[in-house]
């Protein structure tokens, strides 16, 4: 779920903090992805073959990212916080899985993801807790350029740049959210923003009844904290949950994941290893895997040749996807907007 109606609030109250992008705009960028969210997309799109379909989807999508010169970093969930247990059980029931089948808790499936990504030469990190929290932390400390996720709680965890709908299709429209610009537009401190997210509704506790996005924002601007809101809210129209665990939720959003800064490295995919895993041990067709790898090698060769041409012409910059596909009008307009706004004040996220 993430944060209830946060995207709605941003659309109406802070549109300057979001913009439309294309996948080519992230050529050369390092992007962190919550593996469970990527896997869930393939589970819903390709029912049946519980383990194969997500692995096949992960294989094809990762190759597409690499072809676009994106450096993906996949993060696996660790042990979920106890505050999220009820939410996970509810999700499992709604999808028809048992909780043990969920990618959040399936250690065997996590090992298969690790093996696949290792064979593809892509880094994969096991988070101590929520993968989303570690993704946000990596963006906050500058290890990655952005987080690709459909869950808005990336922003509540302090992720500086969130990408939604990054699905590896060249013509798809991606929505990019900037946390510093969002705080500026809403005129909130980061700590106030986290309390706003809890008021809107998150995965870790209940929420005050009857508070919509506009009302919650108004109350936080007036009273700055949840404690201040509780002192002034009408409890008849906005009942406060019994034994409300909002402080635990707040702590989870503020908490820094206990993990050493990862050393990230990418390498060429191991085609024979991939064929052995996906086609010999799993029932994916070998001709499909080899055909996709051939297309991938051709794209890499084309990029290298273009770089050589650029070097001969005295161009030392790294080649981007725009070198192979003409820039669209939207991309040129976005580039101009970025240059125009480059001098704006930035907020530091603690």
From Swiss-Prot:
Pfam families: XPG_I (PF00867), XPG_N (PF00752). Its cofactor is Mg(2+). Interacts with PCNA. Three molecules of fen1 bind to one PCNA trimer with each molecule binding to one PCNA monomer. PCNA stimulates the nuclease activity without altering cleavage specificity. Its EC number is 3.1.-.-. This is Probable flap endonuclease 1 homolog. Residues 317-325 are annotated as: Interaction with PCNA. Phosphorylated. Phosphorylation upon DNA damage induces relocalization to the nuclear plasma. CDD domains: H3TH_FEN1-Euk. Binds 2 magnesium ions per subunit. They probably participate in the reaction catalyzed by the enzyme. May bind an additional third magnesium ion after substrate binding. GO terms for molecular function: 5'-3' exonuclease activity; 5'-flap endonuclease activity; DNA binding; magnesium ion binding; manganese ion binding; RNA-DNA hybrid ribonuclease activity. The lineage of its organism: Eukaryota, Metazoa, Chordata, Craniata, Vertebrata. GO terms for biological process: DNA repair; DNA replication.
């Amino acid at each position: 779920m993430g944060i209830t109606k946060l995207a709605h609030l941003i659309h109406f109250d802070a549109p300057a903090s979001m913009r439309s992008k294309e996948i080519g705009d992230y050529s050369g960028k390092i992007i962190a992805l919550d593996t469970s969210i990527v896997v869930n997309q393939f589970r819903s799109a390709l029912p049946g073959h519980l383990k194969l379909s997500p692995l096949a989807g992960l294989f094809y999508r990762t190759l597409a990212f690499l072809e676009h010169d994106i450096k993906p970093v996949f993060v696996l969930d660790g042990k979920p916080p106890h505050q999220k247990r009820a939410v996970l059980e509810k999700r499992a029931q709604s999808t028809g899985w048992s909780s043990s089948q969920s990618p959040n808790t399936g250690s065997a499936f996590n090992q298969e993801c690790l093996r696949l990504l290792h064979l593809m030469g892509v880094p994969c990190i096991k988070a101590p807790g929520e993968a989303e929290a570690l993704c946000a932390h990596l963006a906050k400390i500058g290890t990655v350029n952005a987080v690709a996720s459909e869950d808005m709680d990336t922003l509540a965890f302090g992720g500086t740049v969130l990408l939604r709908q990054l699905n590896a299709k060249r013509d798809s429209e991606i929505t990019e959210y900037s946390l510093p610009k969002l705080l500026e537009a809403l005129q909130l401190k980061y700590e106030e923003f986290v309390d706003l997210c809890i008021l809107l509704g998150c995965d870790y506790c209940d929420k005050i009844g009857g508070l919509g996005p506009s009302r919650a924002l108004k109350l936080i601007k007036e009273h700055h904290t949840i404690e201040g809101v509780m002192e002034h809210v009408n409890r008849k129209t906005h009942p406060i949950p019994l034994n409300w665990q909002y402080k635990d939720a707040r702590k989870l959003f503020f908490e820094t994941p206990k993990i050493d800064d990862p050393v990230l490295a990418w390498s060429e995919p191991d085609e024979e290893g991939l064929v052995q895993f996906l086609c010999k041990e799993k029932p994916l067709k070998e001709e499909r895997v080899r055909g996709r790898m051939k297309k991938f090698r051709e794209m890499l060769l084309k990029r290298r040749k273009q770089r050589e041409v650029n070097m001969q012409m005295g161009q030392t910059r790294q080649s981007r996807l725009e070198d192979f596909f003409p820039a669209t009008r939207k991309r040129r307009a976005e580039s101009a907007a970025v240059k125009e706004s480059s001098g704006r004040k930035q907020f530091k996220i603690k």
